[in-house]
UniProtKB/Swiss-Prot annotation:
GO terms for molecular function: large ribosomal subunit rRNA binding; structural constituent of ribosome. Component of the mitochondrial large ribosomal subunit (mt-LSU). Mature yeast 74S mitochondrial ribosomes consist of a small (37S) and a large (54S) subunit. The 37S small subunit contains a 15S ribosomal RNA (15S mt-rRNA) and 34 different proteins. The 54S large subunit contains a 21S rRNA (21S mt-rRNA) and 46 different proteins. Pfam families: Ribosomal_L14 (PF00238). InterPro entries: Ribosomal_uL14, Ribosomal_uL14_bac-type, Ribosomal_uL14_CS, Ribosomal_uL14_sf. It comes from Saccharomyces cerevisiae (strain ATCC 204508 / S288c) (Baker's yeast). Disulfide bonds: none annotated. SUPFAM superfamilies: Ribosomal protein L14. The keyword Heme does not apply. This is Large ribosomal subunit protein uL14m. It comes from the Eukaryota. Belongs to the universal ribosomal protein uL14 family.
Length: 138
């Protein structure tokens, strides 16, 4: 569960490391927390420094500190979300993947966490591109 001002880990290679949630975009109550598969608006709190290529241009998909981005929650530390078959899954941390605001495509090209796993509910909600980038779908 992600509330406003929650700091979460970014697990793609877009350059961001930590993001702070500033708005939950979902149907229902505006004060309800974000669950796995929900879209959030976040501010990048910590990012890797931009490096220049040999040609002298920076990567276009990179984000920097202070940027406002959209993201999809892919893992949650809370265990209170029950699936249709009655099982529950809890991960060790809460993580998200940055996406394009208009198209919904991921900004990064890889999911780079220690294990690279995401929740299965993303596939049910139509985020097949994120599931294909992940090494495991649990």
């Amino acid at each position: 569960m992600i509330f406003l001002k929650s700091v979460i880990k970014v697990i793609d290679n877009s350059g961001a490391q930590l993001a702070e949630c500033i708005k939950v975009i979902r149907k229902g109550s505006p004060k309800s927390p974000a669950m796995v598969g929900d879209r959030i608006v976040c501010v990048i709190q910590k990012a890797k420094p931009l490096t220049q290529n040999i040609t002298g241009t920076a990567n276009t998909n990179r984000v920097k500190k202070g940027d406002i981005c959209h993201a999809i929650v892919v893992r949650s530390k809370q265990r209170n979300m029950c699936r249709k078959d009655g099982s529950t899954v809890a991960f060790g941390d809460t993580a998200c993947v940055l996406i394009n605001k208009n198209t919904g495509e991921p900004l990064g090209t890889r999911i780079m966490a220690n294990d690279g796993c995401v929740d299965r509910t993303l596939k049910d909600k139509g985020y097949n591109k994120i599931c294909s980038l992940a090494s495991r779908v649990i």
